[in-house]
């Protein structure tokens, strides 16, 4: 299917339009928006357990105890635009309640968080069309690595940003440090998406393709945050209709939009490799004739 689309489009248009057409066909065949909806639903069910596990991990590392509060503010300010304060207040209440649970309940939180990892794994491997199965132990190790490395990377990034802020007193460094801090969320998103696209698929992902796809996803994510906040501010229809409950559809809409961006970055990464293979096959076919 992809080969026939590439051949038809490549004859009539340039490489960029042929690649965009190939990308559109992949998005349609993979039902990307449906996958994003499924992940949004699972994410909302797993949100409180996931956050509870993350902050429990921070409590286990004394070196990050001082940045735990900063991390909360950073996450809600940079990853949940608009209504972030309200959502933060509710989630912190839920997490505080979850800390009173027994060992069995804590195990349930961890399992629920790992189920979110499994849903992400399934969605990305659907996009990569990979049917190879990992050993269960290896899959668990990958999920646990994402669950632990993610918070630790975020904590380390906050330590670095705090260090940069402490250097602002040095003359001549103010402008440069301000510029670095301004693009810091973008760099963190880029690194996170690159790790996601490189580690989770069960097939080999070229590093260059993953870097390009993750960069596009990170840029769209940063623009999406500003656009979503602007939409909520300029068109407050959800607040008018739902009142106090407006936070629920707003949160779901933002999570869905975020997963659309994540999966689009994955589709871009895959399509770069597919397009390169199709061009190589077309070149070899032309040489054989």
From Swiss-Prot:
Keyword check for Cell inner membrane: yes
Membership in a protein family: Belongs to the UPF0761 family.
Pfam families tied to this protein: Virul_fac_BrkB
Listed GO CC annotations: plasma membrane
Protein name: UPF0761 membrane protein ESA_04062
Subcellular location: Cell inner membrane
Lineage of source species: Bacteria, Pseudomonadati, Pseudomonadota, Gammaproteobacteria, Enterobacterales
Key words of the record: Cell inner membrane, Cell membrane, Membrane, Transmembrane, Transmembrane helix
Transmembrane segments: 44-64, 104-124, 140-160, 183-203, 215-235, 244-264
Membrane topology according to the record: Multi-pass membrane protein
Species name: Cronobacter sakazakii (strain ATCC BAA-894) (Enterobacter sakazakii)
